[in-house]
Amino acid sequence: MELTLKLLVLLLFILNHHVGSGSIVKFLPGFEGPLPFELETGYIGIGEEEEVQLFYYFIKSERNPKEDPLLLWLSGGPGCSSITGLLFQNGPLALKSEVYNGSVPSLVSTTYSWTKTANIIFLDQPVGAGFSYSRAPLIDTPTDTGEVKRIHEFLQKWLSKHPQFSSNHFYAGGDSYSGMIVPALVQEISKGNYICCNPPINLKGYVLGNPITHEDDPNYRIPFSHGMALISDELYESIREACKGNYFNVDPRNTKCLKLVEEFHKCTDKLNEFHILSPDCDTASPDCYLYPFYLISFWANDESVRDALHVNKRSIGKWERCNYLSKPYNKDIKSSVPYHMNNSVSGYRSLIYSGDHDLVVPFLATQAWIKSLNYSIIDEWRPWMIRDQITGYTRTYSNKMTFATVKGSGHTAENKPQESFIMFRRWINGQPL
């Protein structure tokens, strides 16, 4: 009996160590043959009782894992799985856009994965996103600031289990709503590095694409739409005069402004706001360029895929790519601008980039809050090039901040994978764009 108990305890220890340390994935359903890169998946327990289990995908750099930087990538939402980044933006795999026939959707290799120059952790956060879950009902509604602390704890524990990466330069990154989380996380890590008993994280900076930053961001949709010839000069001048720059939190008594804003929506509501040049199409249609967003649900909910990824049994029900409409969440960070200021003062590098055809977070909104920081301009506005072709425009500021546009791209980087990869590679290597 005593021997049986000892064996049981040993087995539980091995299993827990196996889960906590992550599992190597060599094959994935839908991909032909062994994976051409090193993938690890796993959970890190958060909290005193480790009741929150955050799921991650870790992919080693294809260049030099020992020397290349470590990047934590967070998807937006809030509540979108980080598989959005892995399969649709900057990872080494993509879903093949072919008509769903009931079998596991196919995966193909990508050419311009950011893992060619960095080790990347794709983290499902907040709790409840992707394959992350809580063992017990949450007492409090997840919040921006609460998730920042959880992600910080995740990083500390992940690095303690992967000490070989503790000396690598560390960067945080993400897009869209991660524009609220990442700057706060960088500040949290920076402060945490001064606490005596925690091993310091070798923090160097952060990268953000089309980041939501301030509640005023939507006000820039109207001047952006005018500049893109989506609304007439007459409507723009009238709405600017009537609304005084406040277009999306209008005083109900300002009926003239409200009526003009309604006219604006009539001109733009049928556009694809994530990329104004792309069709506004149904993702369930095989003809839609976003059809892979429809296929991902079949892939991630297939039992063979979950087994291959080592997803804990019965941890979640149906997997959703984004669950921000079905899960409660408190957005308690109203502006991330103060965090940008603090991080710059602390000496951290930052790359802020914008797809110039995004109506959700127009590049004008990003330029406006960067301008509000009052940083000196080190390198004036200029085109950045790939093989003698203009691929965007860039400006470098004091306090190590770089702003860049990606010409022809939308809300996320997948629209221009080559350009976004080369931009990231140059910046992460300390080269001018």
UniProtKB/Swiss-Prot annotation:
Tissue: Ubiquitous.
Enzyme kind, highest EC tier: hydrolase
SUPFAM superfamilies cross-referenced by the UniProt entry: alpha/beta-Hydrolases
Gene Ontology terms: biological process: proteolysis
Localization per record: Secreted
First-listed, main subcellular location of the protein, grouped into a coarse class: secreted
UniProt xrefs under PANTHER family: SERINE CARBOXYPEPTIDASE-LIKE 11-RELATED, SERINE PROTEASE FAMILY S10 SERINE CARBOXYPEPTIDASE
Protein name: Serine carboxypeptidase-like 11
Species, as recorded: Arabidopsis thaliana (Mouse-ear cress)
Chain's gene name: SCPL11
